[in-house]
């Protein structure tokens, strides 16, 4: 053994430097959070569970233009449009999203001209069966009603960058 190796092993240099490093981090604030009880910060651009939004008067926003269906790379969206109304507008009779196929790319949200389909802030939507991940229009509208306040706040925060 060389002399420097003997000195290091006798003086326990590695042990002391490791202990000093541990003591340094002991007094710093913790970097981890206790997840189920504490929630970390999410960006306004976070892409979570899908939702269909309504106008303040309660009418659904979707105008059945089918741009989201056309732009979806996973082909997870299926839309059927109803007949035109007396005022010339259309609404959907069927709006389905297969969340198993969805890759959460956000292209449907980008393509929508009236901000009807959005990816909301909810990421805790575990299910027991695969069929529960087939979202129909009623479930999407219920998600929109439940998360509307936070969705509107996120869209407003992101508006300068769109």
Curated annotation (Swiss-Prot):
Q: Which Pfam families match?
A: Fer4_7
Positions of disulphide bridges: none
Give GO BP annotations, semicolon-separated: aerobic respiration
According to the UniProt entry, what is the EC number of this protein? 7.1.1.-
GO molecular-function term, one example from the UniProt record: quinone binding
Specify the protein's topology with respect to the membrane. Answer: Peripheral membrane protein
This protein is called NADH-quinone oxidoreductase subunit I
């Amino acid at each position: 053994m060389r002399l420097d190796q003997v000195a290091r092993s006798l003086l326990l240099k590695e042990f002391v430097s490791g202990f000093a490093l541990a003591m340094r981090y002991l007094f710093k604030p913790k970097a981890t959070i206790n997840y189920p009880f504490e929630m970390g910060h999410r960006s306004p651009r976070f892409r979570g569970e899908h939702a269909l939004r309504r106008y303040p008067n309660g009418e659904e926003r979707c105008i059945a233009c089918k741009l989201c269906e056309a732009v979806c790379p996973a082909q997870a969206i299926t839309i059927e449009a109803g007949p035109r109304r007396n005022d010339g507008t259309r609404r959907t009779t069927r709006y389905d999203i297969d969340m198993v196929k969805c890759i959460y790319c956000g292209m449907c949200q980008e393509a929508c001209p009236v901000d009807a389909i959005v990816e909301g802030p909810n990421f805790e939507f575990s299910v027991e069966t695969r069929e529960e991940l087939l979202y129909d229009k009623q479930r999407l509208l219920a998600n929109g009603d439940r998360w509307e306040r936070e969705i509107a706040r996120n869209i407003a925060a992101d508006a300068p960058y769109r």
